[in-house]
Amino acid sequence: MKSFLVAGCTSDAGKSVVVAGLCRALTRRGLRVAPFKAQNMSNNSAVTPDGGEIGRAQALQAYACGLTPSVDFNPILLKPGSDRTSQLVVRGIATGNVSARSYIEHRTELRKIASESLNSLRERFDVVVCEGAGSPAETNLRATDVANFGLAEECDLPVYIVGDIDRGGVLAHFYGTHQIVDDADRARIKGFVVNKFRGDVSILEPGLQDLEDRLGVPTVAVLPFIHGLWIDAEDSLQSTIGATVGPAAAPLGTQRLRVAAIRLPRVSNATDVEALACEPGVTVTWTVDPDSVAEADLVVIPGSKATLSDLAWLRSTGVADAIMERARSQRPILGICGGFQMMCSHIDDPVESGSTTPVEGLGIFDVDIEFHPEKTLIRHENGGYEVHHGRVERSTEQPWIGNEGARTQSNFGTHRHGYLEDDEARRDFLGTVSTLAQRPGFVVAPATSFEAERNKQLDVIADAIEQHWDLDQLIAALT
């Protein structure tokens, strides 16, 4: 029963990737390993086999361990719906919307829930790799902390601090984090981990030695910048406006398929487009530009944590006009979950938006959507999962996937996330889209495996950790 906490100097320091790599590396050594994150704030989520909802990063980390997702891996999930409120998901079940202040009022109860989940995992696994949240150095939050030093204190965890050197100032980040926390928390810090290093490590070593001389804490690993990591990236990392997703590999034929993914302000499960991006000849770009929407061969309207708000944004930016012109021209559009709902005739949402009257959608599908307090959580055996409050109340459209979603000649809508990760389904879809988009020179690759690509990237991370972090020493130091 060994466990430790991987915290970060900042958000996006690379904690999730490091934990995924540790999970894979330790699992390859024959250990029974589980991931854990007490509290995650993310609109990227996954569904467990028993119908619970957790952060997608923890689902990936579980996959790295060879495990199916469990609510114990992420007992508290916050899904931001606005700048001030988030939906609170506790042990897989949505409990309502909370403000930052009201969330703090529940911290004692939530800390107990997190500790119970972690202790349950510690009883069942050889090693539990815990991930912190944001920065552990927010002293204004320490008294009610659930995920960082508060968890480490409650469960007696050693702590390793990850810093992103690619941003610059990593030594100051390490020093400041160490110095600002109190003595008891400081004593838990067992090592620093430099992440995303480029160049000659010997040039960095004098600085690391100076840091150790000042603080008495060693740097246990200098992890390299790994090019080409893109599958299952967290939140804003993978959906930057203008960014191309994935490798944009050369086409097998004479033409590419250009996919414009609309970067909604409250985009959720943005990872849905990654399966398309893994295909040779498919270029997926995040955009908010109406011209890009008009020119693309396929437009994807992804999920949203604020469907009505993001629909209003589409209209205010002119993107909705470009989408409607595509629909009139019968050029392919794919809506996923919230994106599908926006494509419908009417949306009645008293749950997430608090709207008292139905709102007109884009009207591409003759479908009415009504939001219900009870969230639909389904993990499909044949691929994909559903996470949504909105339900189809009326439809005259042909279903798309089984008896779900909607399909017209050139438009596709579904509540199902992850459907295109199924290789055969993705190939069929791309063949249809290339025909509709009049791209006869695009050739669908016959054997691309999204799962193989995911495993390849996890192994690359694990290999880097094995090479640059003494895992024998790490395991020996754990209690």
UniProtKB/Swiss-Prot annotation:
Keywords: Cobalamin biosynthesis, Glutamine amidotransferase. Coiled coil: none annotated. One of its GO terms (biological process) is cobalamin biosynthetic process. GO terms for molecular function: ABC-type vitamin B12 transporter activity; catalytic activity. Pathway: Cofactor biosynthesis; adenosylcobalamin biosynthesis. The active site is at C337, H417. CDD domains: CobQ_N, GATase1_CobQ. Belongs to the CobB/CobQ family. CobQ subfamily. Catalyzes amidations at positions B, D, E, and G on adenosylcobyrinic A,C-diamide. NH(2) groups are provided by glutamine, and one molecule of ATP is hydrogenolyzed for each amidation. This is Cobyric acid synthase. It comes from Corynebacterium diphtheriae (strain ATCC 700971 / NCTC 13129 / Biotype gravis).
